[in-house]
């Protein structure tokens, strides 16, 4: 993500120069979806602080979802973490971030509306399905504070040698319960043994992300 990227309102900024802003990201994502036979629509509007923004609506296997490719780029969150609703906890968190954040990938209207307000001259689809949501497909979506599911999430991350684990909660009740178990009661050390664990939480997006200074 680079505000000074050349031709940053077009797909050229992405494919020719490897850097862009939200409009370039969204148009490039739309183009790739369309090349793959996936219907995709460019959506423009604003985010929480009134800043103009662009994202997409895509149709996967007959169901519509929203996807914000620029907010999925960690370099964007480094520039505007507060705008993206992410609260950092732990001095090492920035250096341990993965390159992709899935909080805004194939989400519902209800989820995207927490941070995004569309302003387009055409009706947008009501996105209600979670079937192809990243966290659902990866077993990281929690409808209750299921500690066996938590254990499986960390075991899978270790097997796949991933440096972080993000848990997505269905609602605030689940979020608060997992926060209490893993952080307040420090049960996180059952899954990431060691002296310290870096983490980031987003109550707005109902996610808890954990890293260690060494790989899982």
Language model features with spans:
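N-terminal accessory/pre-domain segments preceding catalytic cores
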Residues: 13-14, 103-216
């Amino acid at each position: 993500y680079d505000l000074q990227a050349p031709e940053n309102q077009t797909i050229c900024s992405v494919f020719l120069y490897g850097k862009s802003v939200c409009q370039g990201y969204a148009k490039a994502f739309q183009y790739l979806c369309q090349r793959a036979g996936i219907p995709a629509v460019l959506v423009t509007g604003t985010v929480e602080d009134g800043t103009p923004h662009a994202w997409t609506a895509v149709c996967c296997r007959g169901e519509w979802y929203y996807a914000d490719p620029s907010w999925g780029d960690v370099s964007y969150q480094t520039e505007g973490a507060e705008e993206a609703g992410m609260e950092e906890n732990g001095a090492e968190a920035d250096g341990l971030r993965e390159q992709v954040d899935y909080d805004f990938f194939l989400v519902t209207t209800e989820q995207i509306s927490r941070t995004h307000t569309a302003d387009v001259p055409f009706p947008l689809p009501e996105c209600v399905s979670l079937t192809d949501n990243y966290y659902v497909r990866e077993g990281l979506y929690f409808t209750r504070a299921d500690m066996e599911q938590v254990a499986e999430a960390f075991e899978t991350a270790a097997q796949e040698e991933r440096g972080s684990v993000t848990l997505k909660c269905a609602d605030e009740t689940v979020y608060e319960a997992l926060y209490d178990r893993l952080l307040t009661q420090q049960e996180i050390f059952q899954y990431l043994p060691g002296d310290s664990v870096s983490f980031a939480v987003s109550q707005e997006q109902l996610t808890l992300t954990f890293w260690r200074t060494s790989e899982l």
